[in-house]
Amino acid sequence: SNLPRLDSTTVFQSANSIWIHDKSPVKDSFQQINRQYFLAEIQNLDFSEPKSTGIINRWAKEQTQGRIPHILDQAQGNCILINTLFFKGGWIFPFDPAETRQENFYPVSGKKHPVSMMHLSDQWFAFHKAELFEMATLPYGNDSYAMTVILPKKGVSIDSCIATFSEANWKAWLSASDSISCMLDLKLPSIKLDYKSNIIPIFQKMGIHDAFNANCADFSRMTDMPAYISEIEQFTRLEVTETGTVAAAATITNVVFESEIVSEITPY
């Protein structure tokens, strides 16, 4: 709740919603907690009606300022939980559009791609040289928000850099960069990209398994019926230009309720 108030010149918005299929038995206490603490919008819909999918997609589109217009082909399950994030910030030190040129960019594949390369010279930025990479911090607005750009050293892969990321290391790197400023000649591609991913494997790598297993999941605070998470998808949009950055994300979680299984092993 404090993040949107950090900078009046930068937009940061978070929204939550819960969509309940028809009369699926979601506990009132669960709904009340989400309304009170997460400011969630909660609606009952008939997922079998095509208009329900449209209603949910429009909500996501509105909350992401049109950046993520479509997150569902067909509403499924018994309960859909959605979180959205939207960010729009202007650089403290904007790039001059007149300095933007078509140049080659070399992604992980090594195959060159022509891009619009932005250029900013003779400007001071927080900077740090780690063992495997260099990092520079580009601030927005009143300096409450910033983008940290990481450039692997020659011969070092992105994956090798990511493997060193931990909370402790990240704090140490940021602290080191805050204490050192460096005048940089900075080149950064103008970016507009969309990304969609099933993020259940990420949770599983973190040790979370039961929530996705119909035989083990415990959602008794949500419903008295057996329930499990069938799907978590995340949609993201990132736009980086000479003036600043727009970023949006929508994460959708499908929860399926199952009927109690009654085994009749004696005459009935």
Residue ranges and their predicted role:
Residues 2-160, 175-262:
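Non-catalytic, conformational "gating/processing" segments within enzyme and secreted inhibitor domains
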Residues 266:
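Long, His/Glu/Asp-enriched segments that create or flank divalent metal/ion-associated functional microenvironments
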